[in-house]
Design a protein with these regions (language model features):
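Conserved "landmark" site that anchors the functional core of diverse proteins
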Residues: 1-289
């Protein structure tokens, strides 16, 4: 096909196609999905003159390899890994050349963008894979990835030498204290339990994934009754009976019955997403500016 662009040689620890996610389907129980770190993904696209929400490949940690099927430009962002191409800048790739992502050093999710954006089937208006819901699938060795649309490849002018501002590059090993807004049941926790949450250094557990990030630390000793299930959004912080907070992520449930301590600021969801298992994170009350 004229728009075939990359072949998956080795999928590594796993990857999917993701864009900015699907909107308007939560009431039917369909989560938004989409990129875990929209800051990194949008920068990879902008470097190539793509729209910020163009479809990218999202990769977990390390080990993926791709072969170019034709000349094109790519940009890689997000979690830092040893690679045979530089990060955070447009890179020309010739047909037959390989892109190899090796050992991970910081962060959890890496993004591979191609000039024009990746194509593929849409589900409810989005190409974002939601594997648990049978919308799209994880990448497999041998998969052929296509460019969006069928237009001939045209390498954009003036992109060689581009990079992102240094202030936009994040040190994923040292996230800031993440901002939290009040949630509908925040008042149920009272001042003592809320202060405990903000004063505790929490650890991201190995069970954390695209559905939710589970945190370990000194439990919030708060034994509330289960509530009626009600809508939750990406970034909702729920506290189950064991006192260990769970933060809803992109593939998370659309309703939940645990008390909601707070809502992670949308700009900080990407920061939390890049925290690896075992990494520590702190939170702070968000304030109006």
């Amino acid at each position: 096909m004229a728009n075939e662009v990359l072949r998956v040689v080795d999928r590594g620890l796993g990857g999917t196609l993701q864009d900015q996610g699907r909107r308007g389907w939560r009431k039917y129980g369909v989560p938004p999905s989409g990129v875990m770190d929209d800051h990194a993904a949008s920068w990879a696209n902008r470097l190539l003159d793509n729209s910020a929400g163009a479809t990218v490949v999202e990769l977990l940690l390390q080990g993926a390899k791709f072969e170019a099927l034709r000349n094109t430009w790519v940009a890689i962002s997000g979690a830092e890994v040893d690679a045979n191409v530089p990060f955070w800048r447009p890179v020309p790739v010739k047909a037959g050349e390989r892109i190899e992502l090796r050992q991970n050093h910081s962060g959890r999710w890496t993004y591979l963008a191609v000039e024009g954006g990746f194509g593929g089937p849409e589900f409810f208006g989005s190409r974002s894979a939601y594997v648990r819901g049978a919308m799209g699938s994880a990448l497999a060795d041998g998969d052929v990835l296509v460019k969006q649309g069928g237009k001939p490849f045209q390498l954009p002018d003036g992109i060689a030498g581009r990079t992102i501002p240094s202030l936009e590059r994040r040190d994923y090993n040292h996230p800031p204290a993440l901002k939290v807004w009040p949630a509908p049941q925040s008042e149920l926790f009272g001042r003592r339990h809320s202060e405990h949450f903000f004063e505790t250094t929490w650890t991201v557990t190995p069970e954390s994934d695209r559905v939710g990030y589970r945190l370990a630390g000194t439990p919030i000793e708060f034994p509330p009754d289960r509530l009626l299930s009600e809508p939750v959004r990406v970034g909702t912080i729920q506290v189950p009976e064991n006192g260990m907070p769970i933060v809803t992520m992109r593939d998370g449930p659309t309703v939940g019955g645990y008390p909601k301590l707070g809502m992670l600021d949308p700009s900080d969801v990407s920061w939390l997403a890049q925290c690896r298992p075992g990494q520590q994170v702190r939170f702070q009350p968000a304030r109006e500016t």
